[in-house]
Amino acid sequence: MYEEANAFRRNKFEEYAKKKIAYSEELRLETEREQKQLAAKYAMAAEERTGLTTEDVYYKALLHWISENLERTAASLAEYLARTDTVGEKAQTARSLLVVIYAKQKNFEDATRYLVEYDGREPRRASEVSRMNNELAKAYLAAQSPAKAVQFADRAYRTSKSMLADPSLKTRGLDELLDNGMLLFESQRDSGKAAEAESALTDMRNVAAGVGASDLYFYAADKLLVYLIDQGRKSAAMEGYMSALIEAGKAFSNKAVANDAIRRLKAREKHYKLMAEPAIELPGVDRWFPGQPQTLASLRGKVVLLDFWATWCGPCFDAFPHLTEWQRDYGDKGFVVLGVTRYYGRAEGFNVDNPNEIEFLKRFREKYRLPYDFVVTRDQQAQIQYGATALPTAVLIDRKGTIRFIESGSSPSRMEEMHRRIKALLAEQ
């Protein structure tokens, strides 16, 4: 039963590929939901059986794990470890999962107890060590205890670095290096240790250069530059930007990889220059609805999010639920979303003039129940001015009218970061 449930997602996507069914986020979520339901069904069937062997109890726990029933997973794993014949890899995996579960539940006492038990036994797998310490670091950060998160984030990061030496773990190691490196940075930053926070990002950038990962190099360099700007050290950030460009050209042995890192950094140059500067009025505004036209200067005292978007932009749609939620949750606290778009001369697959495009935008706003004003410009000057060459691009302006954040895209991590920024800016007076 476990093998079927565990392989369900992989088998379904192989089936979709054979049938030439296009991948979509909705399809992924539906497939995962079906997998969880199947695992839950099999887990409950196992619960009703008597005389389960030690191995049966272990796989019953894993079925609960797939179904995301943490309480039953923990109970089954504890039942498994209480048996006298639990040794080796399965027992260690059971302990590692208990650490993860208790960390997610903010039960730090039991999480650290099982971590100590895990560390005192063999075998110890790097992937499990990384995951356990990652979850504990995240839990302490969520509990507003960044100083306690540091030791776990540091161990998770060092472990993910060690994984890069094993070719079979390199891809996973890079993914975990990014996650754990950012956890270490955030833990140090939120603990008030600026030098250590900078060091974490610098080390991650250096590691990326060493293994030829241009995307990770850019990500670490970008986060460091934004952090320096946030710290009021913009001149140091711009010097760091030039240094990162030069270093990219030297550090990567593969010229194509070096050029990719340089291209990514140059695409952000406009944003670095705009951050920590006064917001510039939007040029060429033609229509503003349903509210009355305003200037950005008149909105001082509020936190403003300029969302540069277009009706044909798929990722823009992914941002709509977040923008809607934030406008409704924080509107009475002085938060304003403005959906900034421009005339494209197209609507619903047809060429249209400006008045008809406006009517289409009004219907679009109603259809998707977007509770904020649309700002329509005559041309792309506003996009160029704010470096919104990729859509969606979000610009956050603080209560004093200063640009504090600019990012493109609508990935979950980006939306999470934007939400954190919004709450921080609203807390400022």
Identify the residue ranges that each predicted region occupies:
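Helix-turn-helix repeat elements of alpha-solenoid scaffolds
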Residues: 24-41, 65-78, 103-116, 146-162, ...
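N-proximal helix/coil linker or "cap" segments that precede and/or mark the start of modular domains
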Residues: 229-285, 297-300, 347
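A short beta-strand-turn-helix
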Residues: 282-304, 327-330
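Short active-site neighborhood of thiol/selenol oxidoreductases, capturing the structured segment around
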Residues: 293-317, 323, 337
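Thiol/disulfide oxidoreductase modules built on the thioredoxin-like
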Residues: 366-372, 376-423
